[in-house]
Regions:
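Short gly/ser-rich loop at a beta-strand->alpha-helix junction or flexible surface loop bordering the NTP-binding
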Residues: 1-210
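Surface segments flanking catalytic/ligand-binding clefts of nucleic-acid enzymes
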Residues: 7-16, 23-39, 48-52, 187-298
Length: 298
């Protein structure tokens, strides 16, 4: 039996308690900041199902340089501010895929995951395959029936429609100039011809809404286009009745034959006159270290 006289009561000062509390807070802060840093290196947003982590992160949104650009998805504010629209969309999709493993993406979202050129104006609502998602989807989501999605693939940890199914679904919906950017990048990625793309569309999409527009887009697609900006400006030439230019034509420097230059657009007129067109990206005027030329916002 233990007697009260044997019990020693030790009084812990408030200073010690505060120190322990501060230590726990510091450890939690360091742990979460490390996770945010690691997630940023992976090109994604931090997604967490842990209520303790979620409460800590939301308490510090607006402080500690932490932002919550989408519900349950977190990152450093300075990282988010530095991203392009396409980079933000790409990280959001990867974060959602981490938070909702049962989600699958199609359309413009899948095109981003496949590395295709998706103009900024097409970014916004999520494109999800209707696979019995575990949570209620927000308004504005574009749903696709599983039987229309076909076999799904996993790319960078994200479930998406196959490469060519993704391209087809985009071309069935995209306006001409936007669709041309996607089609050009698809040909460039796979090294196939516009004829191959037209045949795929005929075999898979004939009779569907948007098929005729998709075929027009495919008939002008050219894998030599180097970025979405070049594709969209070529689409404007086509739409306004100008001759379709040759792309990436090479010229030798008359002063140094070992140097070769390529031009974005080249026209040879009927009278023999040659016209060169160049699309200069913003990066050309901002890069100071001789890096590669940038492209305009598509």
């Amino acid at each position: 039996m233990v007697h009260l006289s044997d019990v020693v009561v030790t009084k812990v000062s408030n200073t010690v308690l505060k120190h322990k509390h501060a230590t726990r807070n510091t450890l939690a802060r360091n742990r979460m900041l490390a996770r945010l840093t690691e997630t940023a290196k992976q090109g994604a947003l931090l997604a967490t199902h842990d209520n303790t982590e979620l409460m800590w992160l939301r308490r510090h949104v607006g402080t500690d340089d932490i932002a919550e650009p989408e519900p349950y998805l977190f990152c450093f504010q300075h990282d988010w501010d530095a991203l392009t629209s396409a980079e933000r969309a790409l990280r959001t999709i990867k974060g959602l895929a981490e938070f909702h493993p049962d989600w699958a993406f199609w359309g413009y979202d899948a095109a981003l995951i496949w590395g295709l050129e998706v103009p900024n104006d097409l970014l916004g609502p999520r494109f999800l395959v209707k696979t019995g998602c575990s949570v209620t989807l927000s308004s504005g989501c574009r749903l696709l029936r599983p039987q229309m999605a076909g076999a799904l693939e996993r790319v960078d940890g994200v479930r998406v429609t196959s490469f060519w199914r993704t391209v087809e679904e985009c071309l069935l919906r995209a306006p001409f100039s936007y669709g041309l950017a996607i089609a050009d990048s698809a040909l460039r990625a796979k090294g196939v011809s516009r004829g191959d793309l037209c045949e795929r569309l005929r075999a898979d999409c004939e009779g569907r809404r948007g098929y005729r527009r998709a075929q027009v887009i495919a008939s002008y697609a050219d894998g030599l286009s180097e970025n979405g900006g070049e594709s969209r400006f070529r689409a404007f030439f086509i739409a306004y009745g100008f001759s379709v230019p040759e792309l990436q034509v090479e010229f030798r420097d008359p002063l140094d034959s070992s140097q070769v230059f390529r031009v974005d657009y080249f026209w040879r007129l009927e009278n023999g006159t040659c016209v060169i067109g160049e699309l200069d990206g913003k990066g050309k005027y901002t890069l100071q270290d001789g890096g590669d030329r940038g492209s305009v916002d598509p």
